């Protein structure tokens, strides 16, 4: 997998996957410096950008840490106590769509995080919905964010 990173424009691992790729031990607690070092190690594998999901520095918060060259950023958002299956795939898909439309790293991170959070918020109060998130109601917002056009 590490060899494939040399050919990637962007890699989008969660924290566990990022540690495995970088050959670093996984830790339950970490600092901003730890994540900065992890992003640097991922960039040394060769991708143009590295984006790590599931990074939280404060209780009740999670977010996205990303780096490309000398640009580094962190985009925080609310963390919910429930587990929502498929959110990594939702995030990666939304990020890729924004990135391929020419959005910057910062904008792609933001658009994908906001969309994923909207999908979670559409789902979190439905105890019968156990098999993923309700992504369809937020698609119009995603399209508008990526294209800058009202999809209606």
Regions found by a protein language model. Give the residues of each.
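Conserved phosphate/ATP/ADP-binding segment of small-molecule kinases
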Residues: 1-72
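Short, charged, surface-exposed loops that flank catalytic or proteolytic processing sites
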Residues: 27-34, 100-110
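Glycine-rich beta-alpha junction loops
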Residues: 17, 54-58, 78-81, 112-117
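Short, small-residue alpha-helix embedded
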Residues: 20, 82-105
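Charged C-terminal helix
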Residues: 106-152
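Short pre-catalytic strand/loop immediately N-terminal to key active-site residues, enriched for Gly-Thr
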Residues: 72-85
């Amino acid at each position: 997998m590490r060899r494939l990173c040399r050919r990637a424009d962007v890699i989008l691992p969660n924290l566990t996957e990022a540690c495995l790729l970088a050959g670093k031990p996984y830790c339950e607690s970490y600092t901003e410096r730890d994540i900065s070092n992890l992003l640097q190690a991922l960039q040394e594998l060769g991708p143009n950008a590295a984006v790590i999901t599931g990074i939280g520095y404060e209780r009740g918060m999670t977010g996205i840490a990303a780096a490309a060259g000398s640009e580094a950023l962190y985009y925080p958002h609310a963390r919910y106590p429930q587990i929502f299956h498929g959110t990594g795939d939702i995030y990666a898909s939304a990020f890729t769509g924004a990135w391929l439309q020419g959005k910057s790293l910062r904008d792609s991170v933001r658009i994908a995080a906001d969309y994923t959070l909207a999908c979670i918020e559409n789902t979190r109060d439905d105890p019968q919905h156990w098999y993923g998130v309700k992504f369809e109601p937020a698609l119009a917002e995603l399209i508008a964010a990526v294209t800058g056009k009202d999809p209606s």
